[in-house]
């Protein structure tokens, strides 16, 4: 194998297209480990093929859900939701046994969401009066939904989401919910497709 050493490769006068590799080429390597390949400002990279290995990963990421049994929510009491099972947790950043918090150790912007399926033990069609799930950061509410139902519902499934900055060390997220029942006590339904909480880092 021969080696070509030069400073600049350019097209001849009258041509504006350079072809590197032809019918015998299978792989073209640019640089070796530790090298930097600079793309100057104003240059356009036009891709008509398949690009792999670019971009970043949407991690840390997790999704947890309420499992085993429905969770009691005291009447008009803002209660932390105990999402006690994990669908996934890429960086072990979610506590599913004690504080039910997500504390990512990578700084950035995160998309955070929760789905809470609320109902009452009475089970009637007029027993659920009010429901408000909320996402908190470091103990302060940053997003919530309010459903003031009067006396018209048996079950409701509000979804709340927000994009939030996390410092990658001490910032944490958790979910609280308040339910008011005309009759019976408030509850959240368990199940991976019901009451859940998740987040992932956004590539910016």
Model-derived regions: residue spans:
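Intrinsic low-complexity, repeat-rich intrinsically disordered segments enriched
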Residues: 1-75
């Amino acid at each position: 194998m021969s080696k070509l050493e030069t400073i600049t490769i350019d097209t001849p006068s009258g041509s504006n297209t350079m072809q590197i590799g032809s019918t015998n080429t299978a792989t073209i390597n640019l640089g070796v480990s530790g090298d930097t390949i600079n793309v100057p400002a104003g240059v356009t990279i036009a891709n008509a093929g398949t690009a792999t290995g670019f971009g970043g990963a949407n991690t840390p990421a997790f999704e947890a859900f309420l499992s085993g049994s429905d969770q009691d929510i005291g009447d008009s009491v803002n209660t932390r939701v105990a999402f006690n099972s994990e669908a996934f947790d890429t960086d072990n950043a979610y506590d599913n046994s004690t504080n039910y918090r997500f504390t990512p150790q990578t700084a950035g912007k995160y998309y955070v969401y929760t789905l809470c399926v609320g109902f009452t033990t009475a089970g009637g069609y007029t027993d659920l009066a009010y429901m408000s799930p909320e996402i908190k950061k470091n103990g302060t509410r940053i997003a919530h939904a309010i459903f003031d139902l009067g006396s018209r519902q048996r079950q409701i499934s509000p979804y709340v989401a927000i994009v939030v900055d996390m410092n990658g060390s001490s910032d944490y997220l958790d979910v609280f919910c308040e339910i008011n029942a005309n009759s019976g006590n408030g509850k959240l339904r368990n199940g991976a497709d019901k009451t859940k909480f998740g987040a992932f880092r956004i590539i910016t």
